[in-house]
Structures are given as C-alpha cells and as structure tokens.
C-alpha cells in the first residue's frame, strides 16, 4: 500500500525526490503520512481535494483487500 501511494504521488509531483511516505501502525489501522515539497502540495491534493480523495479511495480498496484499515494524511 505504501508503494501505491508513493507511485501516485511521485507521478504527480514536480520533484519526485521530495515525496516521503511514512507508515505508522495504530491499534487496528495503518496511518500513511504523505509529505511532498511545498510547491507540489496543490498538485497532489488537487482542486477541491479531488486527487487526495481519489488516493484515499484507492488506499481504502487496497486495505479492504488486505483485510485491514488504512488512513492517508497529508503533512
């Protein structure tokens, strides 16, 4: 799942080297924290959060297939 988020974010970002995904396991869920360069935040989040929401949906689907829960946070 971490690789999926990294792949999508690096494809969108102007500076793919600045993309960092951190995975934190809490209780019964996994929290993925996505960090990108300041100038790429708008691109990665998208208009009215559409890209961010699409990434969250894909992450949720992958988590359900794996039998877990996952959350995506933008830092």
Descriptions of predicted regions:
Residues 1-43, 47, 52-75:
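RNA-contacting regions in translation and RNA-metabolism proteins
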């Amino acid at each position: 799942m971490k690789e999926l988020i990294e792949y999508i974010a690096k494809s969108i970002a102007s500076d793919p080297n600045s993309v960092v995904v951190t995975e934190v396991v809490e209780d019964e869920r996994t929290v993925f924290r996505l960090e990108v360069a300041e100038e790429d935040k708008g691109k990665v989040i998208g208009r009215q959060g559409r890209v961010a929401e699409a990434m969250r949906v894909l992450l949720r689907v992958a988590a359900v297939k794996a039998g877990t829960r996952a959350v995506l946070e933008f830092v």
